[in-house]
């Protein structure tokens, strides 16, 4: 790097530090900021570690909220405030003293003690306490799947008695009836001229045969037989913080999607990705199998934590949840393909069609495994 370019880079870093410092100062921070640096991959640089000088003060995480995905930032942060406050109260009641490592803590702004985000130049920022001596995991194996089941089940259990209603941060996110109506509308409009393709017609026929069964949750919900609960709605193994030695799950993170939903959102969506042997865009469908080891480990952990508050009908419908989410994702990928690939990024013209076919192949693998799935769940109830 030439001296001139090196100097320019240093100036840009100094300017960025100054801008970020001014954002941090909008929050009620009592510590002195030492440095601010990107946290995570650094590809987007929307998350920063705020290092403080004082040894008795925590470091912080400064994060920009993606208001394109979550346009109602106030609702997102209100939900998070309700959830984290309730978890903190439950942990205290259980005798937990190390709250810092077991629940996220967001700082209020200087101007408003009840507001947990600041608006700066049309962008929205929040500041939370950094949880040290913690790591995330990417690999899904039976051990991490069991930990995930326990953690997300415990998360739901702690929030089963939240006294106030949370908002829906992404409307109809896991509403199967809505997703099917979206697909029907895409077929009528046929924006990309793909409706008559043989592969599309074949997949539509197979999805249509299962549509009534896959919308059972919405029907039971309207009849008052199936409750909506506070769910995480983005259950992935990397949305948990583990202790450094990996022996303990400390905290569930990434709470932007926390909202009311059927419990299947957290149970089924985790298994959709974690229990498949192939990525969701793998074109060789022979590589797609349903991992019984991951399913059993996750289910065992989940029921150990969640069984105490689940209704008999919710438990009875857990097998339905396992097939629901790959089905839903197949519908959503096909919808995007028919609409001209405007939602998910694609690498080639039929990418979304392959994704839709891939997820439907997983549906078939789950259907084949259904007797074993039901038998294992029943074995955990005895």
Where on the chain are the PLM-derived regions?
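ATP-dependent phospho-/nucleotidyl transfer catalytic cores
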Residues: 37-41, 63-74, 131-146, 161-232, ...
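Juxta-kinase regulatory segment immediately upstream of eukaryotic protein kinase catalytic domains
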Residues: 13-36
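Conserved ATP-binding subdomain of kinase catalytic cores across diverse folds
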Residues: 36-39, 43-184, 188, 263, ...
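All-alpha amphipathic helical-bundle segments outside canonical DNA-binding/catalytic cores
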Residues: 143, 310-322
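Activation of the activation-loop gatekeeper triad in protein kinase-fold domains
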Residues: 253-258
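N-terminal amphipathic/basic-hydrophobic helices that include classical n-h-c signal peptides
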Residues: 1-14
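Protein kinase-like catalytic core scaffold
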Residues: 60, 102, 126, 229, ...
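Active-site activation/catalytic loop segments of kinase-like enzymes and analogous catalytic loops
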Residues: 260, 264-307, 324-343
